């Protein structure tokens, strides 16, 4: 953002950014930067409403493939957990797509955040220091939780209609909002067993 007037036709892709995104805020005419997102945070939805963010619809499971097959990435920057003793950085909560983006990038920049959790699985959840061009380090504030949405009477009614359709051994995904929170509480008291959880996101539900 500080170099705005030196730069032109810079396209930036983000994903669930809490904001503010300085390159957007400093260039409301979009003469220098164009900002795109795959999944909108509340902040990015407000940017879309103002015409300052372009939403690209995408099924999450296809996103890594889409990067690997179709997109050019000049510079990629990702937040990571601190490097382990073997020289690997863990991609933490964005393991589903980060490795594909970093593999496509001409330049890889990592920002180390000491508060990010380490997630396990396969090998796409890490990147080795030898594959990194630059590392940014600094102090970070601890993460804060999103405030819970209070449930309405309608949320409670819908949750009560859904509960009888969930059986032992079912896999559920409970998103963000009043109704998923109510349904989660009903499930906890229901006596159902062996429930699985689809963990695209985890909420208090």
Language-model segment annotations:
Residues 1-205:
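Conserved alpha/beta enzyme-core scaffold
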């Amino acid at each position: 953002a500080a170099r705005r007037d030196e730069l032109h036709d810079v396209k930036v892709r983000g994903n669930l950014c809490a904001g503010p995104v300085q390159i957007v805020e400093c260039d409301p005419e979009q003469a220098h930067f164009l900002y795109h997102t795959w999944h909108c945070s509340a902040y990015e939805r407000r940017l879309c409403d103002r015409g300052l963010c372009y939403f690209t619809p995408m099924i999450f499971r296809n996103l890594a493939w889409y990067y690997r097959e179709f997109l050019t990435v000049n510079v990629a920057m990702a937040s990571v957990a601190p490097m382990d003793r073997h020289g690997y950085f863990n991609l933490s909560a964005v393991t589903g797509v980060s490795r594909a983006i970093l593999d496509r990038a001409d330049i890889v920049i990592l920002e180390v955040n000491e508060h990010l959790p380490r997630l396990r699985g396969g090998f796409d959840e890490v990147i080795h220091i030898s594959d990194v061009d630059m590392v940014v380090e600094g102090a970070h504030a601890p993460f804060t939780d999103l405030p819970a949405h209070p449930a309405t009477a309608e949320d409670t009614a819908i949750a009560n209609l859904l509960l009888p359709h969930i059986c032992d051994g079912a896999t559920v995904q409970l998103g963000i909002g009043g109704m998923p929170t109510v349904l989660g509480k009903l499930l906890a008291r229901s006596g159902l067993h062996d429930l699985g959880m689809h963990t695209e996101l985890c909420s208090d539900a």
